Amino acid sequence: MKISRSRFYKPWILFATILAIFAILTIFYIVVTKYLMWKSKEIQENFLDSTPKYSSDVGIVSMIKDPKNIETWLEKHRTLGIKHFYIRLEETPDLEEYLESQPDVTVKVGKSTGVNEYDEIQTRQNKWVNQAFELAKLDGNNVQWLIHIDCDEILKGDLKKVQDLPEDVRTFWIQNIEAKFDKIPGKEDNCFNASKFAKCGTKNSGCVSYANGKSGGRVSSDVSCFGPHRMKSQIETKESVKLDDLEVEHYESCDFDIYKQKFKNLSVQDKENKIPFSYYNESIEAAKEDNDDKLQEIYQKYRIEV
């Protein structure tokens, strides 16, 4: 009795089909498993990136007005390990409720004088820093150090270096670097993106604003503000220590509208201008003329990466 070819090959065809399906399922399983492992690792890394690197007893004190991307500013510093924020909020009512709802933020609402703001801002900053020191002594947040920066500045580095300072060190300072952009940024751009940074404090650095850094001090009765860039201590016998493990990224006028409004505000003066920066003086003169073309030229000249 003859067996037909189709009957002879049918079991082999079925076996081959099952084997092929098994191979496909195995490959699918391997691919899916590897993808899920990769995705799990990515999620874990993102989670770790958004959690504090170090639980510190360091706080930030700042005086702010119409800040851009305040959520980013807070989150970056929380991730760094900042314990508490002491914020004087000027003429920004839309932010009051939000900041007051943050458990790690102490808010005081204030206002500007509106005249001679280059000098007046520094006067109010000095007063607020000293008030923040007093608040930190009594509020139970266990903040042992305060660092003074602005809302267009981001701290980078290792806060543990602050906490490891010996008891006889009462104040310290950190160098600033200044953001440069590859185009004139607009409202849609996040404030804290830069194409490069100029190393302030070095010769021909390209920094157009301040270059002498920012500072921090112990929360103690002997420490107080000594201008917007330094702290002083009544008992410290040596010069303020420079911390090389921290730096301040300064995103000066991080979009054109902020730049324009800033220098319109600074242009309201009733006394002689003694600002030492060409960038500031040229911008103030253009703002007085309300000349957007000239303002853009100045921004391009000083703030855009060459």
List where the protein language model places each region:
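Active-site-proximal specificity loops/subdomain of glycosyltransferases
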Residues: 95-146
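Catalytic-site signature of metal-activated, phosphate-bearing donor transferases
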Residues: 122-130, 140, 157-306
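Short acidic/polar active-site loop segments enriched in Thr and Asp
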Residues: 83-84, 144, 170
